[in-house]
């Protein structure tokens, strides 16, 4: 498998917990640096907030409500000039289950 010099790998990471997301980014950057690839990032993207409004009372009292929110943290990592060793190392990398990963070549 030959990869030209102009290719790059873009990795998008999403998680509800920012600490797990940052440790996953560190693992990816460490793997890229061990295989002599040039890594740019992690670039933080805006955090998405989803707010849910729920009535506290099961019957009446419409004025009493609770608000719950879910924050979705996102990061982007670009890897320039990846080798086949870099791709193999990224495929074998174990990341936590709370992190959603999207890889584009």
Swiss-Prot record:
GO terms for molecular function: structural constituent of ribosome; tRNA binding. The keyword Ribonucleoprotein applies. Its main location: plastid. It comes from the Eukaryota. One of its GO terms (cellular component) is ribonucleoprotein complex. Coiled coil: none annotated. SMART domains: Ribosomal_S10. Keywords: Chloroplast, Plastid, Ribonucleoprotein, Ribosomal protein. One of its GO terms (biological process) is translation. Signal peptide: none annotated. Disulfide bonds: none annotated. Pfam families: Ribosomal_S10 (PF00338). It is found in: Plastid, Chloroplast. SUPFAM superfamilies: Ribosomal protein S10. InterPro entries: Ribosomal_uS10, Ribosomal_uS10_CS, Ribosomal_uS10_dom, Ribosomal_uS10_dom_sf. Involved in the binding of tRNA to the ribosomes. Belongs to the universal ribosomal protein uS10 family. Part of the 30S ribosomal subunit. This is Small ribosomal subunit protein uS10c. It comes from Pyropia yezoensis (Susabi-nori). The lineage of its organism: Eukaryota, Rhodophyta, Bangiophyceae, Bangiales, Bangiaceae. The gene is rps10.
């Amino acid at each position: 498998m030959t990869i030209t010099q102009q290719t790059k790998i873009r990795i998008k990471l999403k998680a509800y917990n920012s600490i797990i997301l940052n440790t996953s980014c560190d693992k990816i950057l460490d793997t890229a640096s061990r295989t002599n690839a040039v890594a740019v990032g992690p670039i933080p993207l805006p955090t998405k907030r989803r707010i849910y409004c729920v009535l506290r009372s099961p019957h009446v009292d419409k004025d009493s409500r609770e608000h719950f929110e879910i924050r979705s943290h996102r990061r982007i990592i670009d890897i320039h000039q990846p080798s086949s060793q870099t791709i193999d190392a990224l495929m074998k990398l174990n990341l936590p289950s709370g992190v959603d990963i999207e890889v584009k070549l």
